[in-house]
Structures are given as C-alpha cells and as structure tokens.
Amino acid sequence: KEVLDGYEIGSVIKVLSAHRTPEALKEFIETTIKDGTKVFVGIAGLAAHLSGNIAAHTTLPVIGIPGDGGPLNGLDALFSTVQMPRGVPVATVAIGKAGAVNAGHLAAQMLATGDQDLAKKIADQREEQKRILLEDQ
C-alpha cells in the first residue's frame, strides 16, 4: 500500500481467504472490477491459493506475494503461488516484505502502460533510488 500511495494510486485492502471465504472473495473480485480495478495483488502463506483463486475469477493481471510465515518460511507459499496452470497466470514476486514492495512497483508499471504521468513518476523514483545508492558510497 505504501508504494501505491507513493505513486498516488488508489487501492483497496480486504482480508479474505481462498479456503475460508471463497464466496466473499468471488464477490469482492466482481465488485471491484465493476468499480474499476485494473490489477489485483494477493498475499498468502502456507497453501497460498489466494492469488490463483483471484486469477481464476478474472482476466485482469494478478500479482501474487508468497507470505513468509509457517514452518517453511514461505517456500511452500512460493511454490503454491508460482506453479499455476497454463493460461491462468499469476505474476509472482519475492517472498515476504521485499515481494510486497515489488508487487506495488509492478502494479504501478502495469498501470503505467496507459498513463504517461505515472510512467514519469516511476522513472523519477528509479532515478531517486540510483541517486541515493551512489550518494551512500
């Protein structure tokens, strides 16, 4: 959310489960599409079927973040998120916090394909990262 806010991209956060609240998840997906959602981001640990379930209910881009909890520290979530059947893709990022940050940047990049102002904000952010890195040396 912080990354999206930095790009002035609106977002909706909802806690739902592919296993425990499947009907509510489907309804949320349908409602947010009607409201103009362009990209979905899901984070789940362990069996981690949330992002795949979202992808099953929309043709919009879905970004999956494997949660870093559980006895395998997110490795099980990574495999569950990345191993999708042909034709139902989920763009999977790194496990945990780093993945969450990159999911925000990736969502912004997807949206920027049709938004020159957003594309400039992303380019400016990259330049700022470069400046900070070079300054710290």
Regions found by a protein language model. Give the residues of each.
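Short, solvent-exposed amphipathic alpha-helical segments in soluble enzyme
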Residues: 1-6, 30, 57-59, 108-109
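Short glycine/serine/threonine-rich phosphate/pyrophosphate-binding segments
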Residues: 22-23, 46-53, 72-75, 100-103
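Structural motif
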Residues: 19-30
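Short coil/turn connectors at secondary-structure junctions
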Residues: 7-10, 35-38, 58-61, 85-90
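C-terminal binding/interaction regions
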Residues: 12, 73-137
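Glycine-rich phosphate-binding loop
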Residues: 28-70
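Short, ordered loop/turn segments at secondary-structure junctions
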Residues: 16-18, 45-46, 67-70, 95-98
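Glycine-rich phosphate/diphosphate-binding loop of Rossmann-like nucleotide-binding domains
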Residues: 1-20
